[in-house]
Amino acid sequence: MQFFKTLAALVSCISFVLAYVAQDVHVSFPSTAGKSRVMIGKVEPRIGIDETVPTTITVEDPNEVIQVNFAIESTNKPFQNTLLIGLPNKNLEMAFEPEIKDNGKLSMYKYRIDLAKLDAALLQEASRSPEPIKATLILASSTAKPKENLFREILQLNLNFDVDHSDSSLVDKFGIKPEIHHIFHAEPKRVAKPIAVIFVLIIFITILSLIVTWLNSCAAAFNNIPTGVTAVYFLGFIATIVGFEVIFARYYLGTSIFETLFSSLYLGAPGLLTSTKFLRSFGQTI
């Protein structure tokens, strides 16, 4: 039993050694002479809910420069070194990359945060929100275990100065947008009116030209009315013309193109036969 306890303790120590730990974390203010730095201390990974209260700093100068410094063992550098500044609950955060200098067994990390260069949308929302701006440190690698990566809030900034709200559209511009719903319009149930008018004019001019031609050639006269079998072909010819006019009128009023094509096919086959026979026999009697 003692052996297993010792082994478990050894494994825990090894895991702690491999974890990313920020040593001697402190905040300095290089833009303000004489302002003392703020010590945070060692920051290490925490599993589960982190109940540690982050350090709070009140900022009264809108041009303040805040510098976050810490050290990491040179043999255990993380691939991702990011400091997030912003309001996580509002999805307004800016990512800062560090300046890294190797100093023997330790690597010195320095993040420089210039408040004057923070996004206007972030500053405007922070001035309206009761919660402070949060600084979250991320030290992680894809090859490390989740419990070895560091993702912790280390600092809170209370802004004690007036923020310019002249361009209030910035918050809405970078905020969460409502979901886009696209409405697909239904397929048109009738042909476009300009196209229908063009075809009506073409058919009207064609029929009018046909009637004028018949009158000028004396083909349309009472003494030329067909009789016998030719009269049947004549009625079929007239029915074909009237039928196609009705089909086209129904198409313009809302009948689908497929029904129109089927109707034209059903009328066109017998209409072509009777009209051809009528015109052939009628042409011989003119």
Curated annotation (Swiss-Prot):
Membrane-crossing segments per the record: 195-215, 229-249, 253-273
Keyword DNA repair: no
Top-level taxonomic group: Eukaryota
Compartments it resides in: Endoplasmic reticulum membrane
Any one Gene Ontology BP term: protein N-linked glycosylation
Signal sequence, renumbered to the chain: 1-19
Membrane topology annotation: Multi-pass membrane protein
Gene Ontology MF, one: structural molecule activity
Topology feature Cytoplasmic, residues: 216-228, 274-286
Pfam family, one: Ribophorin_II_C
Positions in the Lumenal compartment: 20-194, 250-252
Assembly with partners or alone: Component of the oligosaccharyltransferase (OST) complex, which appears to exist in two assemblies comprising OST1, OST2, OST4, OST5, STT3, SWP1, WPB1, and either OST3 or OST6. OST assembly occurs through the formation of 3 subcomplexes. Subcomplex 1 contains OST1 and OST5, subcomplex 2 contains STT3, OST3, and OST4, and subcomplex 3 contains OST2, WBP1, and SWP1. Interacts with SEC61 and SSS1.
Other remarks in the entry: Present with 8450 molecules/cell in log phase SD medium.
Protein's job: Subunit of the oligosaccharyl transferase (OST) complex that catalyzes the initial transfer of a defined glycan (Glc(3)Man(9)GlcNAc(2) in eukaryotes) from the lipid carrier dolichol-pyrophosphate to an asparagine residue within an Asn-X-Ser/Thr consensus motif in nascent polypeptide chains, the first step in protein N-glycosylation. N-glycosylation occurs cotranslationally and the complex associates with the Sec61 complex at the channel-forming translocon complex that mediates protein translocation across the endoplasmic reticulum (ER). All subunits are required for a maximal enzyme activity.
Protein name: Dolichyl-diphosphooligosaccharide--protein glycosyltransferase subunit SWP1
The organism of origin for this protein: Saccharomyces cerevisiae (strain ATCC 204508 / S288c)
Lineage, top ranks: Eukaryota, Fungi, Dikarya, Ascomycota, Saccharomycotina
